[in-house]
């Protein structure tokens, strides 16, 4: 059967390539819903309700990707600050804002602080998972050695 691209058999990663995703979201029900969706796709997921707990965990080990809400508990802009702190630690860490805030100013601010994407919570779970798969696919492609680095040898002639 031809797949629609959204079936479970279309998962691009094997268990040997499991990625760690951190979700920083102060609303437990929302955090748990996203965590369950990511876990169904084979990702290892950790959730944090606030910036302080996330930073404490990230001091030990950075995840492979972070999903952050802009407003965190008593910090209306705590997600922005977390993004700034994470970007200072790693230029390559994929960061996605997933928030109810949908103004252009919010999105531009998040992207300028270093986020790779700025999405609103009305986005469907399949769409969100597809965005995450695409981000990891691009990262993997950038990490693969370029085909131009191959050496071609014919007799005494070597082309590199």
Give each language-model segment a name.
Residues 25:
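Conserved acidic carboxylate
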Residues 32-40:
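Charged docking surfaces used in two-component/phosphorelay signaling
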């Amino acid at each position: 059967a031809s797949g629609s691209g959204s079936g479970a058999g279309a998962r691009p990663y094997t268990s040997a390539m499991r990625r760690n995703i951190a979700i920083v979201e102060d609303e437990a029900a929302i955090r748990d819903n996203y965590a369950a969706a990511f876990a169904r796709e084979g990702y290892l997921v950790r959730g944090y309700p606030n910036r302080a707990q996330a930073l404490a965990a990230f001091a030990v080990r950075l995840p492979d990707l972070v999903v952050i809400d802009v407003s965190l508990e008593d910090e209306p802009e705590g997600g922005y600050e977390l993004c700034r702190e994470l970007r200072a630690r790693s230029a390559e860490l994929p960061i996605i804002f997933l928030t109810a805030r949908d103004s252009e100013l919010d999105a531009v601010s998040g992207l300028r602080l270093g986020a790779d994407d700025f999405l609103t919570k009305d986005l469907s779970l399949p769409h969100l998972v597809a965005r995450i798969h695409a981000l990891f696919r691009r990262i993997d492609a950038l990490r693969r050695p370029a085909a131009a680095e191959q050496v071609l040898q014919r007799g005494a002639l070597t082309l590199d």
